[in-house]
Amino acid sequence: MSQITLIILILAIGFSCTKSHPINSTRDGEDSGTDLKNLLTEPANTTYATNSTLTRKELNSTIQPERNDEGSAIRKIMASKKDENITGQSEINTSAKSQPINSTRDGEDSGTDLKNLLTEPANTTYATNSTLTRKELNSSIPPERNDEGSAIRKIMASKKDEIITGQSEINTIAKSQPINSTRDGEDSGTDLKNLLTEPANTTYATNSTLTRKELNSSIPPERNDEGSAIRKIMASKKDEIITGQSEINTIAKSQPINSTRDGEDSGTDLKNLLTELANTTYLTNSTLTRKELNSIIQPERNDESSAIRKIMASKKDENVTGQSEINTSAKSQPINSTRDGEDSGTDLKNLLTDPANTTYATNSTLTRKELNSTIQPERNDETSAIRKIMASRKDENVTGQSEFNISTNSNLNTTTHHEDAVVSPTEKVYVPNNASSAELNVSSTIQPKEADATTSSANDIKKPAFPYCIILITFQIVTVGMIIYLVFRTMRKPCQSERAIPLNTFGFGNNSSHE
């Protein structure tokens, strides 16, 4: 009996050692490290350090700008830079290298800086910090609950003779001409500066804090969707024209929202609208739950009037037309996934031009459900939200439908140890994704890597794990062998001395001789 108890105890200890690595995830299956990067091109020696955490309600609040459209808060935004015109409506025009709003407790705006309206040299450093309470944002952002009188009368600003008068929800435009507006809301003189070229060695350090209710109060000025709040966004740079509607026009190299547990965001930074040079390093980390991703890509629950009609863009002879919730192109890491027909290493490469010597260090972890949620923006598919995405580079055309247009010069190459293999774009070398579906989806996920720009490449080489599994299997084989030995020893035939005592009919020894 004691031998059997000892065997059971040994087996229990052995099998308790077979603990698998848990999935590297946050509290509710959030994904850490999702990074959509570098929409077009990027300047040299620029460093970004980002971190974001958004709850589902926070993301829902950022994508619902049009609840009541009886009176649109912003009628037309017309801007010209030489031959450039931008007309349309927008709740939030957040463009490139802007100083966030520094506000006091009573909601008054202190220190708004529309910086470097024409030219900005290299080696420029921005250090900003803003903290707005919900009441402050409520007081500053929804001036037009009753749209009979427009909340934005005049926003006139000039450099040298700069004057800013009027009301504005959030006019966060940096390295650009401030909005000069007339009574009917038409905007004249907006200068979106440096759409092509940006000097190198520019460092940005920003920090902002917004609660979920504050973001909610800043974005939904239009509760009724009878008339869309964004009619036309037309922009031309020489021969370039962009027209269409968009809830969120997030262009190129923006800092994702850094949020704390209560939904406050710190560090929102939209940078570098078009071009950047080489030698750019990004250190990113983000955490989004499946429901949060689902809320990002579903702005059109009621598809009777599509929120995004046309997005037409031309760069010399290049045209992009169609509808898209998220047009994330150029130098972004594609999602490597397995299991349900998910996309493993898709590389839509080099839509425009990709400079050399660009290094990306990313860590992403997406579950199957999270990936499924990012590619299902249209619950009601009667009218598809994305009709055509046509892009041409000289004679190249790409047509079709896509939720994500992810273009890059490097793949997110995942090894069996779940490390991101950084591939130099100049060498044009791609490492295939060899991780099995069981490794990616069952036992473990891609482990986020502590990215450090100063760490040598030698630190990226993982030492092989100690073969605990081999030791455990050997121990179990020995245990099973010992069990078999004990069983056969118990069941062996009795020896000759034991046969000398005959048994009677009832199984007892015959003791008559002793009597």
From Swiss-Prot:
Main location: host cell
A single GO cellular-component term on record: membrane
UniProt keywords, alphabetically: Glycoprotein, Host membrane, Host-virus interaction, Inhibition of host innate immune response by virus, Membrane, Signal, Transmembrane, Transmembrane helix, Viral immunoevasion
GO terms, biological process: symbiont-mediated suppression of host innate immune response
Membrane topology (UniProt): Single-pass membrane protein
Subcellular localization, as worded in the UniProt entry: Host membrane
Residue stretches of biased makeup (Polar residues): 86-104, 320-338
Transmembrane segment boundaries: 468-488
Signal peptide: 1-20
Cited function: Involved in suppression of the insect cellular immune response. Inhibits host hemocyte adhesion and phagocytosis.
Annotated protein name in UniProt: Mucin-like protein Glc1.8a
Species in which this protein is naturally found: Microplitis demolitor bracovirus (isolate Webb)
Organism lineage string: Viruses, Viruses incertae sedis, Polydnaviriformidae, Bracoviriform, Microplitis demolitor bracovirus
